A protein has these predicted regions:
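TPR/TPR-like alpha-solenoid repeats
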Residues: 169-176
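Short coil turns that delineate tetratricopeptide repeat
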Residues: 58, 124, 157-160
Length: 187
């Protein structure tokens, strides 16, 4: 909410120059005002939607998946998704209002991700089984393929097949236009 307020305040100053993080400098005061205003409106929309869903008791992992952003915001050139998605902003809003608790009972005192991954890998039939499944999903569900690659890697970080899978899946995810992943950490 503070971000939206700050953007509206900046828009009211009739600035003659705006240097955005991406793209060319803006020098038309009307265009600057419109850009700042639509950014504020977008943030306000996400905050309002997120808070309304939380107040209805919607589980957090479903709140950000329930976003149905109005077309005029989705198609506005100023709101071209670069690094942060609408869902990411909703998650930030939730973190502010509800903290770390995500309504999933096992997350209260969870096992480490490494331990969870080792058990998931074992249940799946080993790293090779996860490798086959993740690669089968690469073209249709890169997000799920990423989860599977993470389980293989974190469950068995010394396994060369797990490392190759992790690298291949995230290299694919970087170039996938449906994902806002821009970089990768490779071990």
């Amino acid at each position: 909410e503070e971000w939206a307020g700050a953007l509206r305040e900046m828009a009211s100053e009739n600035a003659a120059l705006l240097l955005p993080a991406h793209g060319e400098a803006l020098t038309d005061p009307e265009r600057i005002q419109e850009n700042l205003t639509v950014l504020a409106e977008a943030l306000e929309w996400v905050v309002a939607h997120t808070k309304a869903e939380l107040n209805k008791g919607t589980r957090q992992d479903l709140v950000y998946r329930s976003l149905e952003v109005p077309d005029y915001l989705l198609t506005h050139p100023t709101l071209n998704q670069q690094y942060v998605s609408w869902e990411d902003i909703s998650k930030m809003v939730m973190r502010r209002y509800v903290g770390w608790w995500d309504d999933i009972p096992s997350h209260w005192s969870p096992a480490s991700f490494d331990a969870q991954s080792a058990v998931i890998t074992e249940l799946a039939g080993g790293v090779a089984a996860l490798d086959r499944r993740a690669r089968a999903l690469l073209e249709t569900d890169v997000v799920m393929a990423s989860h599977i690659a993470d389980w293989a890697w974190f469950g068995h970080p010394g396994d060369p097949l797990a490392q190759r899978l992790l690298i291949d899946v995230y290299a694919h995810r970087i170039v996938n236009t449906d994902s806002n992943t821009q970089e990768i950490l490779a071990w």
